[in-house]
């Protein structure tokens, strides 16, 4: 490799490996956002935080096989933890899926939680979400406590473990895992 190629290659690799400048880190307060749900109800993150012990923001998709693999687990987790004042909100980003497709998909899979259609991927940009499925767990004060995958092949219940630790006042370990799945389209 020539000296010139090495000069440009090494910094490029470091940039790819470094966290994005705007990426929220675990421990940061997530800025408030509000948008209507698929059912037309207003959703406000700040309001959800005030009335719940925790908020789970899930980036989900109707067409991503990775996201669809976890539909039953997502449904079960949201129902189980609703009893413990944990609210789930789904975010369907991009224009490749319509609000009606997302609404039908939610009904078919028993997703009883609110889902926001975010065609311009503003929420994904705010949280620096890159994949479906991808989870963000916030405590009641809006602080990011866990970010990453829902589970690893259903055998490593990362999100469940994080929610349980948060509710019990224990440290969340790991507080960050690598989300895998389909890329969230950005404009």
Regions found by a protein language model. Name each.
Residues 1-6:
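Positively charged n-region of N-terminal signal peptides that target proteins for export
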Residues 21-47:
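N-terminal "domain-start" segment that seeds a small globular fold
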Residues 31, 54, 111-114, 129-136:
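Structural micro-motif
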Residues 8-19:
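Bacterial N-terminal signal peptides
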Residues 46-68, 163:
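Short active-site neighborhood of thiol/selenol oxidoreductases, capturing the structured segment around
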Residues 61-72, 95-96, 135, 182-185:
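Short, thiol/selenol-centered motifs that function as redox-active sites or metal-ligating centers
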Residues 139-187:
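Thiol-/selenol-based redox modules, centered on thioredoxin-like
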Residues 68-109, 116-126:
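Structural microenvironment flanking redox-active thiols in thiol-disulfide oxidoreductases
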């Amino acid at each position: 490799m020539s000296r010139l190629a090495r000069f440009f290659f090494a910094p490029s690799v470091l940039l790819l490996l470094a966290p994005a400048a705007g990426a929220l880190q675990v421990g940061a307060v997530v800025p408030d956002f509000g948008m209507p749900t698929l059912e037309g109800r207003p959703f406000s993150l700040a309001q959800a935080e005030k009335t719940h012990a925790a908020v789970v923001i899930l980036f989900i998709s109707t067409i991503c096989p990775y996201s669809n693999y976890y539909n039953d687990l997502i449904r079960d987790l949201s129902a189980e933890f609703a009893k413990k004042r944990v609210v789930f909100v789904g975010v369907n980003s991009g224009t490749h899926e319509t609000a009606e497709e997302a609404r039908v998909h939610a009904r078919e899979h028993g997703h009883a939680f609110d889902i926001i259609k975010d065609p311009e991927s503003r929420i994904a940009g705010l949280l620096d979400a890159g994949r479906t499925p991808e989870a963000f767990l916030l405590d009641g004060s809006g602080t990011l406590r866990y970010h990453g995958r829902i589970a690893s092949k259903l055998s490593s219940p990362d999100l469940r473990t994080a929610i349980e630790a948060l509710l019990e006042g224990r440290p969340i370990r790991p507080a960050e895992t690598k989300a895998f799945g389909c890329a969230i389209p950005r404009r």
